[in-house]
Curated annotation (Swiss-Prot):
S-S bridge residues: none
Post-translational modification note: S-nytrosylated during the hypersensitive disease resistance response.
Chief localisation class: plastid
Induction remark: Down-regulated by dark and high CO(2) treatment.
InterPro entries for the chain: Cyclophilin-like_dom_sf, Cyclophilin-type_PPIase_dom, CYP28-like
Presequence positions on this chain: 1-24
Residues of the PPIase cyclophilin-type domain: 66-268
Family: Belongs to the cyclophilin-type PPIase family.
Organs and tissues of expression: Ubiquitous. Not detected in roots.
Protein name stated in the entry: Peptidyl-prolyl cis-trans isomerase CYP28, chloroplastic
Reactions it catalyzes: [protein]-peptidylproline (omega=180) = [protein]-peptidylproline (omega=0)
First-level EC class: isomerase
Molecular function per GO: peptidyl-prolyl cis-trans isomerase activity
Length: 281
């Protein structure tokens, strides 16, 4: 006759009970998820883009904001931007001012670089003259942007087309301008898609989104740009290794549009209830 095995239940002593209770008590709860950035749209601005068949080279004594730099321009369309004023208030305030100021503004300044399938850059600072076609270097009255030292300002990703971001890692203002104690960064980028641009994440501050005119953004991204050959790139790398300053000057021409695209108008759009949450993904 086969012997049957008998299972003896474990003896729960007072010591084991106390130990298990203590372990359950000191086990830390899972860390709380940090709150998501507030991307409520607090303001709306517009940028009108136009195409000029020639470069801004005539009458270099006139400032960009005083006259129209291109008499035979072709309108490309209007882009309406929603701005995240609760997320990065100083960045948004500065951008709004650059869109509405009657003196120094984005008006009549170019899209100076285009990276197809990724983004384009605008708002580069220069002499504010037609021969440079850049934002005038007179921004000392703008507030210092403390958003750039707030780690939370860098949390939003460049995950789709139509993301508006303050250029930091991609900023290409001249070094002598950036080293000025009164320097104010107003250069911005807009992602063009079709996919995300993760290389921009963590190094630039997302402060808005395209609400209308994404087709205009797409048309700008399709404009041909200057692309150096591989031989030129290798020669440039070697020149930079030798410390030749001309290498950096030459690289500033890369990815420049072969047709002049400029911001022909800009301003703020007043709405009855501007505090909206974006519906874009």
């Amino acid at each position: 006759m086969a012997s049957s095995s008998i299972l003896i239940p474990p003896i729960l002593t007072r010591r084991n009970l106390l130990l298990s209770t203590t372990i359950a008590t000191v086990t830390p709860p899972p860390p709380a998820k940090p709150p998501s950035p507030d991307i409520t749209i607090t303001d709306r601005v517009f940028l009108d883009f136009s195409l000029c068949p020639t470069y801004f080279r005539s009458d270099p004594s006139a400032t960009l904001s005083s006259t129209t730099p291109c008499s035979d321009s072709t309108p490309l369309g209007r882009v309406v931007l929603g701005l995240y004023g609760r997320h990065v208030p100083i960045t948004v305030s500065t951008f709004k001012r650059m869109c509405t100021s009657s003196s120094t503004s984005y008006k009549n300044t170019p899209v100076h670089k285009i990276f197809p399938g990724q983004y384009f850059l605008a708002g580069r600072q220069g002499g504010g003259r037609r021969d440079t076609a850049e934002v005038g270097y007179s921004l000392r009255d703008l507030p210092r942007n403390t958003d750039v030292v707030n780690s939370k300002a860098f949390l939003l990703p460049h995950a789709r087309a139509g993301v508006v971001s303050l250029c930091l890692s991609e900023n290409d203002d001249d070094d002598d301008i950036r080293l000025d104690p009164d320097y104010r960064n107003v250069e911005f980028l807009i992602t063009t898609g079709p996919g995300p641009s993760p290389q921009l994440d963590g190094g630039n501050i997302v402060f808005g989104t395209v609400l209308e005119g994404l087709d205009v953004v797409t048309s700008i991204s399709s404009i041909p740009t200057y692309k150096p050959s591989e031989n030129i790139k290798q020669f440039n790398d070697f020149a930079e290794f030798l410390g030749d300053e001309r290498a950096q000057n030459a690289r500033s021409l890369w990815n420049r549009p072969l047709k002049t695209v400029f911001i022909s108008g800009c301003g703020e759009l007043k709405v009855t209830n501007p505090s909206l949450s974006p519906t874009l993904p």
